[in-house]
Amino acid sequence: MSEFHHVSVLLEECLEALHIRPDGIYVDGTLGGAGHSSQIVKRLTTGLHIGIDRDRVALQAASERLAPYMDRVKLVHSNFSQLDEVLDSLNIEAVDGILLDLGVSSPQLDDSSRGFSYMADAPLDMRMNAQDSLSAYEVVNTWSQEELRKILFEYGEERYAPQIAGAIVRRRETKPIESTLELVDVIRSAMPPQALREKQHPAKRSFQAIRIAVNDELGAVRRVMEVAIPRLRKGGRLAVITFHSLEDRIVKNAMLEAAKGCTCPPSFPVCVCGNQPKVKILTKKPIVSGSEELDRNPRARSAKLRVCEKL
């Protein structure tokens, strides 16, 4: 089997949230190594499971893991933000459940050749889909100082964004920044001594910011939240796991917006807008990992699961 092995986060909670019917149609928009999907398909008899991933390495690993169940599985190489197009291509109008496990999977982080990790030397890449044209190399070596400052601050919530952006531009004037550890060295050089003594790795926020920019991660989340709810049939559920506040804010606000009813001013005697709630939110507060899961998988610490049901 492929080396793409990923420990699924909030697995039991996701299965419960999706309320799986044996004859239902379910979508895993972030298939990865098929950890969640392998448990979903076991609960299907005449149903169908659609797995989507932009990473061909993940798709290959998933196809091996799901081989015994391929009579009820369709695997698609695409971005989850293209959900509409994927379902249209399969002539499927509505589904019973959609699962999204956002963020970078452990195998992508652990495979040093992909350039996601600040702990090992590799070419600056960070593309989840190797066929995409934009890589971390282009972002670091061609984007303006202001563009770099903006993504470091907005996507990485990095307080030293101006200093790091300036250091990147100065270094690349001498020679291009080509590897992950070169970039780590530049980031370290821009930070004050007290920041280097913090528990968190000094490059963590910057690498997150560049990865999000390279893969348009927040744009993809916004787009899928616009199309996912309309593609659920009545009683269908959307379950989304986020790993940082930027994603979580988008998901939370999209679900709240879909759960809104009338938006007329309180002074109006009767409703004239005609808006009806599209979903019921099933998680007043997001579901988080318990102590047992955190002991097994420390990367689950920042995971939050939000769930809504189509009305």
Segments (PLM) and residue ranges:
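S-adenosyl-L-methionine-dependent methyltransferase catalytic core, i.e., the SAM/SAH-binding region
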Residues: 1-311
